[in-house]
Amino acid sequence: FVMSLVDLHKETGVSALDLAKGMLDYGLHPPTMYFPLIVHEALMVEPCETESKETMDEVCDIYCKLFELAHSDPEALHTAPHDTPVRRLDEVGAARNTILRYTFA
């Protein structure tokens, strides 16, 4: 399913990218962002058919926590992730200056 975070963005300034980065702090792989292009502030969530109800409930609980955090402390999501080895990457720079091969030293 696809969800639009336009209202959340208007209310709190938290974007789909911010929410996706916040998911990393909870150990979740973020969904596809900003696709389809006709949906503004889109997150496309595609759970596997084999996921248990318990896992889906846990993911829903994390989404609720993130939405609460967006309203109570939006800056925490603007600066997320906090608990990963690498913080926010320069995604524009990475897209424009791609490294397709890496040589280990």
Regions found by a protein language model. Give the residues of each.
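Non-catalytic terminal extensions of PLP-dependent enzymes
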Residues: 2-105
